[in-house]
Amino acid sequence: MKKFITLITIMLFTTLIGLCGCAGDYRKTVTSIEAMTLTLQGLRGTSVYEIAEVNETTELRRFRKVYSKGEDILELEASATCDTKDFIELMNNCSVIRWDGFHGEHPKNVKDGIMFDFTATVNGGQTIYADGSANYPKGYNEFVRELNKMLAECEEN
């Protein structure tokens, strides 16, 4: 009987903890995107990826930071139009919403690398912020690779 009561108590406690966890972070996926900026800075220069929503599509733009006439300016390097639903699917496949709060410290004994700064507003006002230096969240490399792939496919057409 004592084992039975202990088992019921453990099950009840586990259930309550699980319910609290579910209520704490109810949005584990991106359902809408309002804005996104990804800045990559390395020895070769700085690239800035931005999105802008145009009707039912999302316009992805990549800018290159250049120094001109005494100031840094962003020059449009490439742009592509994609379906907003497809872009949201990419964000979910790469678990972008879980990046929030990520800060990737530069690994010891790594002499170079790319620094990134990511900000997105999703789901009607939820902000995702992540940054790092040669240390990235899970899904980051796939996300950047897919952004570049979208831009390259558009340049080919």
What are these regions (language model features)?
Residues 24-46, 93-94, 100-157:
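Short, well-ordered, aromatic-rich surface patches in folded extracellular/luminal domains
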Residues 41-69:
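Post-signal-peptide N-terminal segment of Sec-exported extracytoplasmic proteins
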Residues 62-99:
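A short-motif feature that recognizes glycine-rich, charge-decorated loops
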Residues 18-21:
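C-terminal motif of bacterial Sec signal peptides marking the signal peptidase cleavage site
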Residues 1-4:
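Positively charged n-region of N-terminal signal peptides that target proteins for export
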Residues 25-31, 48, 73-82:
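Conserved, charge-rich beta-strand/loop surface module that forms ligand/interface-binding patches
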Residues 53-56, 81-89, 120-126:
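A short, structured loop/turn motif at beta-sheet edges
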